[in-house]
Amino acid sequence: MHHQQRLRANGGRGGTGLGAGSGPVSGGHSPLCAHCRGQLLPHPEEPIVMALGQQWHCDCFRCSVCEGHLHNWYFEREGLLYCREDYYGRFGDACQQCMAVITGPVMVAGEHKFHPECFCCTACGSFIGEGESYALVERSKLYCGQCYGKRSCQPADAKARITTAGKPMHSIRLVEIPKDATPGLRVDGVALDDGCPTVRITDLFCNFFLWLTSMAEQCCGAPYRIDVNLTNLHIGDRILEVNGTPVSDSSVEQIDKLIRSNEKMLQLTVEHDPVQVCRSCSQADIQRAMSASTLILPLSTSASSVEVGRERLYKTPGEQGTKARKLRQATNASTTIPPAAGATAMTQLKEKERCSSLSKLLDEQHQAQQHSAHPQLYDLSRTQSCRVVQKPQRIFRATDLVIGEKLGEGFFGKVFKVTHRQSGEVMVLKELHRADEEAQRNFIKEVAVLRLLDHRHVLKFIGVLYKDKKLHMVTEYVAGGCLKELIHDPAQVLPWPQRVRLARDIACGMSYLHSMNIIHRDLNSMNCLVREDRSVIVADFGLARSVDAPRLPSGNMTPGGYGSGANSDAPMSPSGTLRRSKSRQRRQRYTVVGNPYWMAPEMMKGLKYDEKVDVFSFGIMLCEIIGRVEADPDFMPRNSDFSLNQQEFREKFCAQCPEPFVKVAFVCCDLNPDMRPCFETLHVWLQRLADDLAADRVPPERLLHEIETFQEWYASSEDALSPTSQRSLNNLDELVKSAVDSEISPVEKEKENMVIKPQDIPKSPHLGKDFSPSGERLRDSMRARRRQRFLGAQEERRNLTPDTESKERALKKALKKCRPFGERGYLVDLRAGAELQLEDVRDLNTYSDVDSSCDTSLNYHDVNNLPAAQEDENTVKPGKEELLEESTNKPSNQESQHHRLAIDDMRTRLNQCRSKFEHLEEASRRNFNQSQHSMKNFFKTPPVALKMFQRLEHEAAALNGGNNCPPPPPRTQRINQTPIFGRKNPPVAIVGQKLQHAESLEDLASSGVAKQLATPAPKRSKATATTKGGQSSNPPLFLPPSLNISVALNSNGNVTTTTNTNSSCPPSASDWLPKKHKLTLPLPSAQQQRTSSNHRLPMCNNKGKTLKPLPSRTGSQGIPASNCVSPTRSSRPGSPTKHLAQRHTAATAQRLTNAAATHQQQHQQQSSKTTRLNILSPEKVHRLGARLTDQKQKMREEAAATASSVGGAGCAAGTAAGSLNGHRTIGSSGTPNSAVGERRRRAAPSPPVRTHFNTRC
C-alpha cells in the first residue's frame, strides 16, 4: 500500500509526540525500530519516523531497492518500502486496494490507481463512481464524501491520526464547488528548481468561505454551520485536476480561465498537506524551499546526497537486517572509537553499501509471489539490470484525447482517429457501441491479446480508455489503410518484388503470433494494414485464441522449418509406430469463426483444427496478391471441397507470376492441414524470393525444389495422411519418387504391377461410431470417410500406372505401420435353423455398408480371434525385428529418457481411451437389455400376417418338392454394431393363384363356385383316393346332377366306372369346414401329392352317385382334386354312432399327420429347398398383406358376379342336393390295395352349413 510518512521534528522533546498506537516510553522499556529492531533511544539529534502505525529510525526509513531516504512519498508492499520510481518500475500500475496489476479500466486518485470494483468506501462499503466526491486519507484509506464529512466532525481525540505537531493527515479529495463561489477562488503557481510546477489555493478563497460560514451562522442559527473541512479545502492545498483535466502542465492563467468559464458545478481534485520537512535533508534545500511560498522537495533522495556523518546511538539486539546494516550498527555501536578510526569505518561503510547490489527482493517467498503475478520476470536480479523494460501500456481519460475523423465502422464498434492533447501523438480509438455480453467478451479478449504482443509487423497496443462506463482501446495509427484497398486499387502499381514483400511481412507477423501460441482465425486482406512505407502489419485480434498445448521443439528441423528427409527414424516412437504430428497434438475442436472466403476447409466442416487454418487463409491472401482478384468464389476459382482450383487459377492469373511465388500459394492452400508449411518456413522462402527479385535475379532452382518437395519431407518427419483429410490415392502426386525408390526391396520390385487387394489395406482400429454416448449423431463418422477413400481407390485402380503403383506401395507401407492390426468387424448369418452366427471379418469394405441411423444397442461376442498360426506369425516377426534393431542400434541414455516420456504419454492417452470405452460399453449394455427382450418377443410371437401365408408356404414347397437342387450359399450382410439378418425371398407367387376367404355370410352364396389353383393341394380325408384317368393334365370338373359315376373293381385289378346322371357333388371340404377344422387337416408329403396327381379320376365317385352340376360360367375351369371329398362328409349321419365316427375320423387324421411329418422330414434331408419360412422384413410383410387384400377383393367381386349370373339355377341345385341320402363322394383308387383300404374308412360328419344353405334357398 501507499502511505504518507510522518516525521518527528520536535528536537529535544525526546519520546513525546509519538503516533497513535505506539505511545510514550513507559515502564523503562524503549520502543523498537520496525526495520532494524534496535531501541529507539531519546536523543535530540536522532529523529524518529512514525508511519503505518510503527516507528523507524530516520536512517532506517529507506527504499528497499535504491536505499534512498524516503521523505514525503513512500510505497509499501508486503512489508517492504519503496520510493515512487522503484515501485512503478517494478510493479507497474498496481491497484491500491488489492495490489493486483491493472489491465482494464482504472480509477485515479491523485497518482494512486484502483480497479473500479476496488474504488469503494472503507466505512460504508459503497462504490464510488466517476465524478462523485471522495477522500483518500493517509494514501491508504478511501472514504466517500458523506463518510469523510462525518469523520471530520468527530472530536480530535477520537481521530486515529499519525501526527507530529498537530497537523492534519494527508489526504487527496475530490470536492464540488457551486458556481456562485468560483469568483472568490484564487490560485497561485510556483515552479521550483527541479521544474515541478504547483498550483495552490490562496487565502482569499478560504476567507470567502469563512465569511460564508459566519453569515450562515447568523442567518440560520447555531444548528446550521458550514465547516471548512466539509468543503475539503485548506490554505496551501495543491490542485491536481480541474473538472477531470490534469493541471500539471498548464499555466496559472489557463487554470484560472478554466475556473471562471465553468458554467456548472466545479470539481477540484486537491491534495492536502502534501509535503513535510525531513531532518535528514540538507539545510540548503530547506532554506531554498522555505524562501518560496510553498515547499516542494524531490520525492526521494539517494543515499549519496544525504549526510550520514553522525553516530548512531543504538545497538541491534539481534542479527536482523542486511550485511550493510550489521556493519553500520557494529561501527556506530562503539562510542569510544577515535575520530580517525571512525572516519575509516565510515568510508568502509559507504563502500560496502555501494557494492551491495543484491536487494532484499531475492528471498524465495518474494520470488514466488512476484513470478506468479509476472511470469516474464527473470530469476536472477543481476540480469534484470541488463534488460530494457518497455514502457507499460497507458490508461487514458476522455479529457486526454481529442476525437478526430471516423476511420471506419463495423458490426461491434467504430474506429476514430484521435490526438493526444499534450503530446500531439496520433492514435486510433476503437469504441465498442454494442453492450451485449459477446461483444464485450471479444473486445476484452482482443485487449488481453494485444497487450502481450510487441512486434514490428503486429499492430501496436498503446492503452485503454474508460469512458461512459465502457472500455475502449487505443492503438497505433496506420496511414496506408487496409491491404484489400491497396490490392484492388487500379491506380496503384504493384511490381512482383513489392508483392512478395507484402506477403513476407504478413508471414513474419504471423510467425510471431504462432510463436506466442496464438491463432488469429480471422486472417484476411481486410485485417492487414499497410504503412506509408508499404510494410504490412497484422491487426484485428477479436477472434484470436490462445492454444493450450505448446508446440514441442523439433530435434531434426532444418533452418527452413521442415524436417530432414534423411532421418526417417525421427518420427518413430519406441514401440516402432509413427508418432502423432506436432500439429495434431495441438489440434482441438474450436468454434467455427471468421470469414468464409478465407476459412480453412477443416474449420468449415466443423472438424478439429489448429494454427494451420491461418496458413490456409494466408494462401488465399497470396492468391489475392498474385491475381489482384477478390477472394469471392465468383472471382477466385474454388472447388466444391472449399479448396483452391489450382489449374484454373494458374491459367487465369499466373501468366507472369514467378513460379516459386505460385508454388508457395498452392502449398498453403493444400486441403490437408499437415501438408501446409508453418509461417516460419514461409517467411524464409519469401525472404529469399524477395531478395532474388529485388536484385533482378532469377529465383534459383533450389528454392523451387524445396517448395515442391516440402510435402515429402514434412510427411516423412511427422505423420502419414491426416484423418481429417478427404484425399484419396489420386492426390498423392506430391510424394517424392527418390524416397520411395530408396525403400523398394527386390521382393517389392517383383510385385510392381500387382493390385492391392481391399483386405490388404489396414483400417482404423476404431469401429465406425456414428453416435456419441449421449445419443447425438456425429457429423462425419470415420466409417463414412473410410468408405469414401475406398471407393476413390477402387476407381483409381482401374487405370493403374507404374508410377501410381509405386506410390500405393509407399502408402501401404506407411499405413501398415500406423494400423498393423486391421479393423474389427462382424458378419451375421441367419441359416435354416434360424441361429444368429457371427463370422470373422478382416476387411469391412468388401461388404455393403448399412445405414448409420440403425440401432447400435445390440451387443455381441468378440469372435475376431486370429488363427493360432497367423497369430504366431504376427507375434514372432516383430520380435525378430526388435532383436535386430536392438543388436544394431544401441539407444543412448538421452534416447531412452525420450522413449520413456513417450511411453508415459501413450499410457495417459490409453487410460483416457479406456475410460471412454467403458462409458460406451455401459451405455450399450443398458440398451442391449431392452433390445434383447424386444428381439425375443419378436421371435416368439411373429406377426399375425405371417400366419396368413402358412398355406402359401406349403403349396410352394409342394410345387418345388420334386426338384433336387444344391443348397444355395448362406447369404450374409455386413454389420457394424448393428445386426442384419440374412433375408430370403418368400415363395414365388403362382400366376392366377387365389386364396380362400374366411367364413362369412356374404361368401355362402358363392361357396359352391369353383376356384382355380395352379398346383394341386393335398386332400383332407383318408376316405378319398385318386385313380389315373385318361386326361391327367386337365383338372377335375364338377358334373351336372344328372350324371352318376359308379366304380367297380374287376378281377384284373382294373377300375370300371359307370356314369349316371341325376347326381350332384357337394362343395369342397375346405369351403364349408370351419376354421378350426381346417387347421386339423393333415398335410400330405410331396410324394403323396405326386401320386394323387398321377391317379386322378374326374367326373365320378366310388359310390356310383351322380355329381352336382357345375354352373355354365365356370364349367370349363379346372378344380383341384382337394376340393372333392368323400360322400361321408357331404351329409350329417343320423345314426347314434355319430360321436364314435367323429372320434375315428380324428384318430385317422392324427395318424396321417404323423406319417406326413415323417415323410416331410425325410424329404427335407434329401431336398435342397427348405420349407421353413424365413423371417420377413416389415416391408415384405406389408407387400404380402396388400397382395392378400387385393386377392380377397377380387374373389368377392367374382363371387358376387357368379351369384348374380347363376340365380335360380343355384337354388334348384341346392334343393336337388338336399334330397340325396348323403353318402356321395368322388372315389378313385390306383391299386387294389388302395381300394381295399378305402372300404375300411368311415365317412366324416356332414357339414352343418348345408341345412342353412338349403333354408336360404
Curated annotation (Swiss-Prot):
It comes from the Eukaryota. Residues 401-686 form the Protein kinase domain. Belongs to the protein kinase superfamily. TKL Ser/Thr protein kinase family. Pfam families: LIM (PF00412), PDZ (PF00595), PK_Tyr_Ser-Thr (PF07714). This is LIM domain kinase 1. One of its GO terms (cellular component) is cytoplasm. The keyword Membrane does not apply. GO terms for molecular function: ATP binding; metal ion binding; protein serine kinase activity; protein serine/threonine kinase activity. The active site is at residue 522. Interacts with LATS1, and this interaction inhibits phosphorylation of tsr/cofilin. Residues 31-93, 94-154 form the LIM zinc-binding domain. Its main location: cytoplasm.
